[in-house]
Amino acid sequence: MTVLRIFRKAAAAFSGLPRRSAGRLPLAALTAAVTFSAGALSPAAADTDFNRWVEGFWPVARDAGVGRDTYRRAFQGVTPDPDTIRLMNKQSEFVKPIWEYLASAVSDTRVEKGREMLSAYAPQLAAIEQRYGVDREAVVAIWGMETNYGSFMGEHYVVRALATLAYAAPRRKDFWNRELVTALKILDAGHVQPDRMEGSWAGAMGHTQFMPSSWSQYSSDYDGDGRRDIWTNIPDALASTANYLKRHGWQSGKTWGYEVVLPRGFDYEAVDEEKTIAAWSRLGVSRPNGRNFPRPSDDAVLILPAGASGPAFLMLRNFYVIKRYNNATAYALAVGHLADRVRGGGPFAQDWDKRALPLTRSQAEDLQTLLNRRGFNVGAADGRVGPATRRGIRAYQRSVGLIPDGYASVALLERISAGR
Protein backbone atom coordinates (compact mmCIF):
# COMPACT_ATOMS: atom_id res chain seq x y z
CA MET A 1 0.00 0.00 0.00
CA THR A 2 1.52 3.34 -1.00
CA VAL A 3 1.76 6.25 1.40
CA LEU A 4 -0.91 8.14 -0.55
CA ARG A 5 -3.30 5.21 -0.39
CA ILE A 6 -2.79 5.07 3.37
CA PHE A 7 -3.74 8.75 3.56
CA ARG A 8 -6.78 8.23 1.33
CA LYS A 9 -7.90 5.38 3.55
CA ALA A 10 -7.39 7.46 6.67
CA ALA A 11 -9.33 10.38 5.19
CA ALA A 12 -12.17 8.11 4.13
CA ALA A 13 -12.36 6.73 7.65
CA PHE A 14 -12.35 10.22 9.11
CA SER A 15 -16.11 10.56 8.86
CA GLY A 16 -16.81 11.10 12.55
CA LEU A 17 -16.50 14.44 14.26
CA PRO A 18 -13.31 16.16 13.17
CA ARG A 19 -10.46 17.72 15.01
CA ARG A 20 -11.71 21.25 14.89
CA SER A 21 -14.90 22.01 13.09
CA ALA A 22 -17.73 19.67 13.94
CA GLY A 23 -20.14 22.37 12.88
CA ARG A 24 -18.74 22.27 9.34
CA LEU A 25 -19.12 18.57 8.73
CA PRO A 26 -22.14 17.38 6.81
CA LEU A 27 -24.73 17.65 9.53
CA ALA A 28 -25.73 14.03 9.12
CA ALA A 29 -22.53 13.10 10.93
CA LEU A 30 -23.86 14.81 14.01
CA THR A 31 -27.53 14.04 13.70
CA ALA A 32 -26.74 10.36 13.37
CA ALA A 33 -25.17 10.61 16.80
CA VAL A 34 -27.47 13.18 18.40
CA THR A 35 -31.23 13.34 18.70
CA PHE A 36 -32.91 15.40 21.40
CA SER A 37 -36.40 16.84 21.72
CA ALA A 38 -36.29 20.39 22.98
CA GLY A 39 -39.93 20.10 23.91
CA ALA A 40 -39.49 17.02 26.06
CA LEU A 41 -39.06 19.12 29.20
CA SER A 42 -40.29 22.54 30.21
CA PRO A 43 -37.51 25.17 30.31
CA ALA A 44 -37.57 25.25 34.11
CA ALA A 45 -37.47 21.48 34.41
CA ALA A 46 -34.73 21.25 31.81
CA ASP A 47 -32.64 23.84 33.67
CA THR A 48 -33.09 22.01 36.97
CA ASP A 49 -32.12 18.72 35.40
CA PHE A 50 -29.16 20.37 33.67
CA ASN A 51 -27.96 21.91 36.94
CA ARG A 52 -28.01 18.47 38.54
CA TRP A 53 -26.04 17.16 35.59
CA VAL A 54 -23.45 19.94 36.00
CA GLU A 55 -22.97 19.06 39.65
CA GLY A 56 -22.72 15.40 38.74
CA PHE A 57 -20.07 16.14 36.15
CA TRP A 58 -17.78 17.88 38.63
CA PRO A 59 -16.01 14.67 39.79
CA VAL A 60 -15.15 13.90 36.15
CA ALA A 61 -13.58 17.33 35.71
CA ARG A 62 -11.88 17.19 39.11
CA ASP A 63 -10.30 13.83 38.35
CA ALA A 64 -8.94 15.32 35.11
CA GLY A 65 -7.22 18.07 37.08
CA VAL A 66 -9.70 20.95 36.70
CA GLY A 67 -9.79 23.28 39.71
CA ARG A 68 -13.04 23.88 41.59
CA ASP A 69 -12.86 27.65 41.14
CA THR A 70 -12.38 27.24 37.39
CA TYR A 71 -15.34 24.87 37.25
CA ARG A 72 -17.59 27.29 39.13
CA ARG A 73 -16.58 30.23 36.94
CA ALA A 74 -16.97 28.21 33.77
CA PHE A 75 -20.54 27.17 34.61
CA GLN A 76 -21.71 30.34 36.32
CA GLY A 77 -25.18 31.14 34.93
CA VAL A 78 -24.90 28.46 32.24
CA THR A 79 -28.11 26.87 30.97
CA PRO A 80 -28.67 24.46 28.07
CA ASP A 81 -27.99 26.19 24.75
CA PRO A 82 -31.21 26.16 22.68
CA ASP A 83 -29.31 26.92 19.47
CA THR A 84 -27.11 23.88 19.98
CA ILE A 85 -30.18 21.74 20.62
CA ARG A 86 -31.88 23.09 17.50
CA LEU A 87 -28.86 22.71 15.27
CA MET A 88 -27.89 19.26 16.45
CA ASN A 89 -31.38 18.02 15.55
CA LYS A 90 -31.42 19.72 12.17
CA GLN A 91 -30.59 17.69 9.10
CA SER A 92 -30.40 19.52 5.83
CA GLU A 93 -31.82 17.63 2.85
CA PHE A 94 -30.56 20.19 0.36
CA VAL A 95 -27.16 19.52 -1.22
CA LYS A 96 -25.36 22.52 -2.68
CA PRO A 97 -23.78 21.76 -6.07
CA ILE A 98 -20.02 21.93 -5.90
CA TRP A 99 -19.85 24.87 -8.34
CA GLU A 100 -22.11 26.93 -6.06
CA TYR A 101 -20.07 25.95 -3.01
CA LEU A 102 -16.82 26.93 -4.72
CA ALA A 103 -18.24 30.20 -6.03
CA SER A 104 -18.97 31.22 -2.44
CA ALA A 105 -15.93 29.66 -0.79
CA VAL A 106 -13.44 31.01 -3.34
CA SER A 107 -15.13 34.30 -4.15
CA ASP A 108 -13.16 37.22 -5.53
CA THR A 109 -13.72 39.01 -2.22
CA ARG A 110 -12.27 36.13 -0.22
CA VAL A 111 -9.33 35.80 -2.60
CA GLU A 112 -8.52 39.50 -2.33
CA LYS A 113 -8.85 39.44 1.47
CA GLY A 114 -6.57 36.41 1.57
CA ARG A 115 -3.92 38.27 -0.38
CA GLU A 116 -4.23 41.15 2.07
CA MET A 117 -3.76 38.78 5.01
CA LEU A 118 -0.80 37.17 3.27
CA SER A 119 0.81 40.60 3.09
CA ALA A 120 -0.25 41.81 6.53
CA TYR A 121 1.21 38.76 8.28
CA ALA A 122 4.08 38.13 5.87
CA PRO A 123 6.87 37.93 8.50
CA GLN A 124 4.90 35.60 10.76
CA LEU A 125 3.73 33.41 7.89
CA ALA A 126 7.27 33.14 6.54
CA ALA A 127 8.48 31.99 9.95
CA ILE A 128 5.59 29.54 10.28
CA GLU A 129 6.30 28.12 6.83
CA GLN A 130 9.96 27.72 7.75
CA ARG A 131 9.16 26.04 11.07
CA TYR A 132 6.47 23.62 9.90
CA GLY A 133 7.13 23.21 6.18
CA VAL A 134 3.53 24.03 5.28
CA ASP A 135 2.76 26.50 2.50
CA ARG A 136 1.65 29.82 3.92
CA GLU A 137 -1.07 30.08 1.28
CA ALA A 138 -2.63 26.81 2.48
CA VAL A 139 -2.68 28.08 6.06
CA VAL A 140 -4.28 31.36 5.00
CA ALA A 141 -6.81 29.48 2.86
CA ILE A 142 -7.97 27.39 5.82
CA TRP A 143 -8.26 30.58 7.89
CA GLY A 144 -10.39 32.09 5.15
CA MET A 145 -12.57 29.01 4.83
CA GLU A 146 -13.12 28.52 8.54
CA THR A 147 -13.86 32.03 9.81
CA ASN A 148 -13.43 34.35 6.81
CA TYR A 149 -10.10 35.47 8.26
CA GLY A 150 -11.45 35.86 11.77
CA SER A 151 -14.52 37.89 10.89
CA PHE A 152 -16.86 35.24 12.31
CA MET A 153 -15.53 32.73 14.81
CA GLY A 154 -18.87 31.68 16.22
CA GLU A 155 -20.89 33.23 18.98
CA HIS A 156 -21.50 30.27 21.27
CA TYR A 157 -19.80 29.96 24.65
CA VAL A 158 -17.87 26.75 24.08
CA VAL A 159 -18.37 25.31 27.57
CA ARG A 160 -22.11 25.89 27.30
CA ALA A 161 -22.30 24.30 23.84
CA LEU A 162 -20.25 21.25 24.81
CA ALA A 163 -22.07 20.84 28.11
CA THR A 164 -25.37 20.91 26.23
CA LEU A 165 -24.12 18.18 23.91
CA ALA A 166 -22.68 16.10 26.75
CA TYR A 167 -25.94 16.48 28.68
CA ALA A 168 -28.44 15.99 25.84
CA ALA A 169 -26.86 13.66 23.33
CA PRO A 170 -28.00 10.04 23.72
CA ARG A 171 -24.90 8.77 21.92
CA ARG A 172 -21.21 9.70 21.73
CA LYS A 173 -21.36 10.97 25.27
CA ASP A 174 -17.75 9.95 25.84
CA PHE A 175 -16.69 12.16 22.94
CA TRP A 176 -18.56 15.22 24.20
CA ASN A 177 -17.44 14.58 27.78
CA ARG A 178 -13.80 14.50 26.68
CA GLU A 179 -14.17 17.69 24.65
CA LEU A 180 -15.84 19.45 27.59
CA VAL A 181 -13.16 18.35 30.04
CA THR A 182 -10.45 19.55 27.66
CA ALA A 183 -12.20 22.92 27.27
CA LEU A 184 -12.30 23.26 31.06
CA LYS A 185 -8.60 22.40 31.29
CA ILE A 186 -7.85 25.13 28.73
CA LEU A 187 -9.63 27.62 30.98
CA ASP A 188 -7.91 26.24 34.07
CA ALA A 189 -4.49 26.77 32.47
CA GLY A 190 -5.34 30.40 31.67
CA HIS A 191 -4.97 30.20 27.90
CA VAL A 192 -8.24 32.11 27.46
CA GLN A 193 -10.90 33.64 29.68
CA PRO A 194 -14.45 32.23 29.67
CA ASP A 195 -15.90 35.34 28.03
CA ARG A 196 -13.49 34.95 25.10
CA MET A 197 -13.96 31.21 24.65
CA GLU A 198 -16.44 31.48 21.82
CA GLY A 199 -16.90 29.14 18.91
CA SER A 200 -19.36 27.10 16.89
CA TRP A 201 -22.46 25.41 18.27
CA ALA A 202 -20.49 22.13 18.32
CA GLY A 203 -17.49 23.53 20.18
CA ALA A 204 -15.03 24.42 17.38
CA MET A 205 -12.98 27.39 18.50
CA GLY A 206 -10.84 30.27 17.38
CA HIS A 207 -9.62 31.68 14.09
CA THR A 208 -9.21 28.26 12.49
CA GLN A 209 -11.88 26.38 14.46
CA PHE A 210 -10.13 23.73 16.52
CA MET A 211 -12.07 21.35 18.70
CA PRO A 212 -10.65 21.39 22.27
CA SER A 213 -8.97 18.00 21.83
CA SER A 214 -7.23 19.23 18.70
CA TRP A 215 -6.19 22.39 20.50
CA SER A 216 -4.64 20.13 23.14
CA GLN A 217 -2.67 18.12 20.57
CA TYR A 218 -1.76 20.64 17.89
CA SER A 219 -2.00 24.24 19.11
CA SER A 220 1.16 26.33 19.09
CA ASP A 221 2.49 29.19 21.20
CA TYR A 222 4.02 31.07 18.29
CA ASP A 223 5.13 34.14 20.21
CA GLY A 224 6.34 32.33 23.34
CA ASP A 225 4.10 34.18 25.79
CA GLY A 226 3.11 30.96 27.54
CA ARG A 227 -0.40 30.83 26.07
CA ARG A 228 -1.67 28.99 23.01
CA ASP A 229 -4.26 31.61 22.15
CA ILE A 230 -6.13 30.71 18.95
CA TRP A 231 -8.93 33.17 19.80
CA THR A 232 -7.17 36.55 19.88
CA ASN A 233 -3.60 35.82 18.77
CA ILE A 234 -3.61 35.36 15.00
CA PRO A 235 -0.01 34.07 14.70
CA ASP A 236 -0.77 31.44 17.36
CA ALA A 237 -3.82 30.34 15.39
CA LEU A 238 -1.97 30.19 12.06
CA ALA A 239 0.96 28.31 13.58
CA SER A 240 -1.47 25.86 15.16
CA THR A 241 -3.07 25.18 11.79
CA ALA A 242 0.32 24.63 10.17
CA ASN A 243 1.28 22.26 12.97
CA TYR A 244 -1.95 20.32 12.48
CA LEU A 245 -1.26 19.87 8.79
CA LYS A 246 2.37 18.95 9.38
CA ARG A 247 1.46 16.36 12.00
CA HIS A 248 -0.99 14.77 9.57
CA GLY A 249 1.64 14.33 6.91
CA TRP A 250 1.85 17.51 4.84
CA GLN A 251 4.55 17.18 2.19
CA SER A 252 6.64 20.31 2.18
CA GLY A 253 7.14 22.01 -1.15
CA LYS A 254 4.40 20.04 -2.89
CA THR A 255 0.97 21.14 -4.01
CA TRP A 256 -2.42 19.62 -3.21
CA GLY A 257 -3.27 18.65 -6.78
CA TYR A 258 -3.71 19.71 -10.40
CA GLU A 259 -6.62 20.43 -12.67
CA VAL A 260 -6.17 18.15 -15.67
CA VAL A 261 -7.54 17.52 -19.15
CA LEU A 262 -8.57 13.99 -20.14
CA PRO A 263 -8.00 12.82 -23.71
CA ARG A 264 -10.70 11.66 -26.09
CA GLY A 265 -11.50 8.02 -25.55
CA PHE A 266 -10.20 8.09 -21.99
CA ASP A 267 -10.90 4.91 -20.01
CA TYR A 268 -13.05 6.16 -17.13
CA GLU A 269 -12.49 2.90 -15.28
CA ALA A 270 -9.32 4.61 -14.05
CA VAL A 271 -11.26 7.24 -12.07
CA ASP A 272 -10.46 7.02 -8.33
CA GLU A 273 -7.33 4.99 -9.04
CA GLU A 274 -3.88 5.94 -7.81
CA LYS A 275 -0.94 6.06 -10.23
CA THR A 276 2.23 8.05 -10.60
CA ILE A 277 1.81 11.24 -12.56
CA ALA A 278 4.13 9.75 -15.17
CA ALA A 279 1.67 6.87 -15.57
CA TRP A 280 -1.24 9.28 -15.89
CA SER A 281 0.69 11.19 -18.53
CA ARG A 282 1.17 8.00 -20.52
CA LEU A 283 -2.63 7.64 -20.52
CA GLY A 284 -2.91 11.08 -22.10
CA VAL A 285 -3.78 13.05 -18.95
CA SER A 286 -2.33 16.54 -19.16
CA ARG A 287 -2.54 19.97 -17.57
CA PRO A 288 -4.47 22.82 -19.21
CA ASN A 289 -2.56 25.06 -21.59
CA GLY A 290 0.24 22.53 -22.01
CA ARG A 291 1.83 23.16 -18.62
CA ASN A 292 4.19 20.48 -17.31
CA PHE A 293 3.84 18.44 -14.15
CA PRO A 294 6.82 19.37 -11.94
CA ARG A 295 7.34 15.92 -10.34
CA PRO A 296 6.28 12.98 -12.55
CA SER A 297 7.14 10.50 -9.79
CA ASP A 298 4.45 11.84 -7.42
CA ASP A 299 1.50 9.55 -6.70
CA ALA A 300 -1.89 11.01 -7.57
CA VAL A 301 -5.55 9.99 -7.64
CA LEU A 302 -7.88 11.01 -10.46
CA ILE A 303 -11.21 12.41 -9.28
CA LEU A 304 -14.22 13.87 -11.10
CA PRO A 305 -16.17 15.85 -8.48
CA ALA A 306 -19.11 16.46 -10.85
CA GLY A 307 -18.71 13.64 -13.32
CA ALA A 308 -17.20 13.39 -16.79
CA SER A 309 -18.73 16.67 -17.97
CA GLY A 310 -16.99 18.77 -15.30
CA PRO A 311 -13.39 19.54 -14.34
CA ALA A 312 -11.02 16.66 -13.58
CA PHE A 313 -8.25 16.67 -10.99
CA LEU A 314 -5.20 14.67 -9.99
CA MET A 315 -5.03 14.80 -6.20
CA LEU A 316 -1.77 14.45 -4.30
CA ARG A 317 -1.20 13.52 -0.68
CA ASN A 318 -1.63 17.08 0.60
CA PHE A 319 -5.23 17.04 -0.64
CA TYR A 320 -5.94 14.13 1.69
CA VAL A 321 -4.15 15.91 4.52
CA ILE A 322 -6.56 18.82 4.04
CA LYS A 323 -9.39 16.28 4.25
CA ARG A 324 -8.19 15.46 7.75
CA TYR A 325 -9.25 19.01 8.58
CA ASN A 326 -12.68 18.45 7.02
CA ASN A 327 -13.48 15.22 5.19
CA ALA A 328 -15.63 16.81 2.47
CA THR A 329 -14.12 16.70 -1.02
CA ALA A 330 -15.66 20.09 -1.82
CA TYR A 331 -14.03 21.63 1.26
CA ALA A 332 -10.57 20.28 0.48
CA LEU A 333 -10.88 21.34 -3.16
CA ALA A 334 -11.93 24.82 -2.04
CA VAL A 335 -8.97 25.13 0.33
CA GLY A 336 -6.53 24.05 -2.38
CA HIS A 337 -8.05 26.33 -4.99
CA LEU A 338 -8.22 29.29 -2.61
CA ALA A 339 -4.55 28.76 -1.74
CA ASP A 340 -3.68 28.81 -5.44
CA ARG A 341 -5.77 31.93 -6.05
CA VAL A 342 -4.24 33.74 -3.08
CA ARG A 343 -0.83 32.85 -4.50
CA GLY A 344 -1.82 34.55 -7.77
CA GLY A 345 -3.30 31.71 -9.78
CA GLY A 346 -6.44 31.93 -11.86
CA PRO A 347 -9.78 30.13 -11.92
CA PHE A 348 -10.22 26.59 -13.14
CA ALA A 349 -9.79 26.20 -16.89
CA GLN A 350 -12.88 24.06 -17.46
CA ASP A 351 -16.37 25.24 -16.61
CA TRP A 352 -18.68 23.20 -14.43
CA ASP A 353 -21.62 21.52 -16.13
CA LYS A 354 -24.46 23.03 -14.12
CA ARG A 355 -26.88 20.45 -15.46
CA ALA A 356 -25.06 17.73 -13.51
CA LEU A 357 -27.03 18.27 -10.32
CA PRO A 358 -26.00 16.19 -7.29
CA LEU A 359 -28.42 14.05 -5.32
CA THR A 360 -29.88 14.88 -1.96
CA ARG A 361 -29.36 12.24 0.69
CA SER A 362 -32.83 10.77 0.28
CA GLN A 363 -32.35 10.70 -3.49
CA ALA A 364 -29.04 8.91 -2.99
CA GLU A 365 -30.84 6.32 -0.86
CA ASP A 366 -33.36 5.86 -3.67
CA LEU A 367 -30.54 5.41 -6.19
CA GLN A 368 -28.80 2.86 -3.99
CA THR A 369 -32.04 0.92 -3.54
CA LEU A 370 -32.65 0.85 -7.29
CA LEU A 371 -29.08 -0.21 -8.04
CA ASN A 372 -29.34 -3.05 -5.54
CA ARG A 373 -32.63 -4.17 -7.10
CA ARG A 374 -31.00 -4.22 -10.53
CA GLY A 375 -28.19 -6.43 -9.23
CA PHE A 376 -25.52 -3.75 -8.92
CA ASN A 377 -24.63 -4.39 -5.30
CA VAL A 378 -23.76 -1.15 -3.50
CA GLY A 379 -24.38 -2.30 0.06
CA ALA A 380 -26.72 -0.57 2.49
CA ALA A 381 -28.90 2.24 1.12
CA ASP A 382 -27.66 4.87 3.55
CA GLY A 383 -27.58 7.94 1.30
CA ARG A 384 -23.80 8.19 1.46
CA VAL A 385 -22.14 7.95 -1.93
CA GLY A 386 -18.87 6.16 -1.26
CA PRO A 387 -16.60 3.82 -3.22
CA ALA A 388 -19.09 0.93 -3.26
CA THR A 389 -21.86 3.13 -4.63
CA ARG A 390 -19.57 4.60 -7.27
CA ARG A 391 -18.53 1.11 -8.34
CA GLY A 392 -22.17 0.12 -8.65
CA ILE A 393 -22.93 3.25 -10.65
CA ARG A 394 -20.06 2.50 -13.03
CA ALA A 395 -21.27 -1.05 -13.53
CA TYR A 396 -24.77 0.23 -14.34
CA GLN A 397 -23.40 2.93 -16.65
CA ARG A 398 -21.35 0.36 -18.55
CA SER A 399 -24.39 -1.90 -18.90
CA VAL A 400 -26.40 0.83 -20.63
CA GLY A 401 -23.61 2.40 -22.68
CA LEU A 402 -23.01 5.51 -20.57
CA ILE A 403 -19.62 6.97 -19.67
CA PRO A 404 -18.71 5.06 -16.47
CA ASP A 405 -17.68 8.08 -14.41
CA GLY A 406 -19.41 6.88 -11.22
CA TYR A 407 -21.13 10.22 -10.63
CA ALA A 408 -24.40 10.13 -8.71
CA SER A 409 -26.53 12.75 -10.48
CA VAL A 410 -30.20 13.61 -10.66
CA ALA A 411 -30.18 12.65 -14.34
CA LEU A 412 -28.80 9.22 -13.49
CA LEU A 413 -31.49 8.66 -10.86
CA GLU A 414 -34.21 9.71 -13.31
CA ARG A 415 -32.87 7.30 -15.91
CA ILE A 416 -32.67 4.28 -13.65
CA SER A 417 -36.03 5.16 -12.06
CA ALA A 418 -37.58 5.02 -15.52
CA GLY A 419 -36.28 1.49 -15.92
CA ARG A 420 -33.71 2.37 -18.56
What are these regions, as identified by a protein language model?
Residues 1-21:
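N-terminal secretory signal peptides that target proteins for export/translocation
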Residues 359-364, 372-416:
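Short acidic, glycine/serine/threonine-rich helix-capping segments at coil-helix boundaries
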Residues 41-46:
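Sec/Tat signal peptide C-region and signal peptidase I cleavage site
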Residues 49-73:
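Mature N-terminal segment immediately following signal peptide/propeptide cleavage
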